[in-house]
Amino acid sequence: MMKLKACRLLLMLAPTLLPALAVSGEAALTETTLQTSHQIFSVAGGKDMDALKCTTPQRRKSPERRPTPSQGDNRKQDPAPAGSEEEIIPLSEEEEAAMLKKALAPPSSEELRRNLPKSEWIKKFHATLSAASRQRIARVGIWGGSHMAAEFFTTEFRQALQERYGVGGAGHINLLYGRPGLNLPVSAFCRTGEWNEELPPRTVNSPKIFSGLGLYAMTANSPHAALEIDLRSTHAKYRAHQVALHFLRQPDGGTFDLIVDGENLGTLDTQGPRAIGVVEIKALMPLSRIELRVSEQKSVTLLGLFAEDHQGAVLDNFGVAGAAGNYWRGVEPELFKAAVSQRSYDAVVLAYGTNDVTGNNWNPERYRQDYRQILIAMRAAMPQAACILITPGDRVTRFYVKKIVKVKINKRKTVNKTQVTTHYDLLTFPQRHAQAAAIQSELGDEYQCMVWDMSIVMREMGGAYALMKRSPPWMANDLIHLTPAGYREMARRFVGWLDLSSGKAQ
């Protein structure tokens, strides 16, 4: 299984072995749940290494998005003739007023009432985290799409949690880093060689993937593949005394070298019956760096990396741009449960919806059925965790109306000009998001989940269109995402709703 330096391995868990006591400095065996294996190393830590700098770019560029040409009797235009000029025509006050009249109405008193926090559930949430943080790490996991992946919202949430319950570290370090829209709470992440990413299918009947807690897998098949992470955080208070790497044991699994703070701890063999494998590094002093080097031409599949301190609170951010709620139905459930058995959560936050309501075939009843299955899957793995649902926020769509006109320059000359007017649909997606939020609220009660309706919060502030017109704007140019300032403002409102802004727990 493992080629090791002497006295490094403290504990090894395997599904077919009988219980035994762990002895410091010696390999020992104990029982664990089905489909898991666990190994622990003890290291000194405390090395002050130079800041990690990647030799190759780590971020992939987002594909350029262009507005969809508008359709209609007088809107669909042929391309402008060669030599023509485009003129941007702003909406007149009358046109804007007429457009705003067609917008989704501000939230009703009933909607505002529905979005009030349930005091008993809030108290239970805090009691759970308070009790956990006094004895160990209190863990909160948040799953969602690009709103969470960007780390602006989650950074505010994480800091509020840790101001209340203690700084427990950075938490999940998403190994998919490099994907557009995904940021990390650590200093640097370098990936070399060929790595293949796998995310769950969105369609229900597609084959399920083998994943860990993050609902993703990342596989290398080449000895030139490597990862190196600077564990020192962008937040000065975060310290990594404990690091856990989750990987997939599989019949054709390969090997990789594990290097911590520049010292090679050994070669890990991932071959075996399909299971969740965990390698945990515990240090007396904070760790600076971890490196993994694939050492042969066989598959090595990684499922997640986690960095934390000894006590306090941790927020594991599993946000991935483009993720949909149906991802929960696209992973092997027993393997996911095995991952949860290795890293359990006191509270779960699901922030889905924006990517679930797109397309031309929006059907609220089908969404209700799908979202119920998401909650069933979550509760099957984490039946006792406190639960919060964050609904999709407000969103509008932009389209352009083009008109080619002839403009007289002088008595003898005219030129073609393309006049472009920007219009906004303030009803279609705000209405869908409001419907999705209402469905989440109904199902939340059934599955013991509090619901924070971000669409109501944004509509109460005037909606996405009004947030775009702020100076500085709180809505990004695509009118789907928010700006960093907008995400921070939403997070502050969420933190207030959750009664996290009242300071350190007694």
Which positions does each model-derived feature cover?
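Hydrophobic/aromatic beta-strand patches that form the interior of the parallel beta-sheet core
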Residues: 316, 388, 450-452
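A short helix->loop->beta-strand "cap" motif at the edges of active sites that frequently abuts
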Residues: 382-387
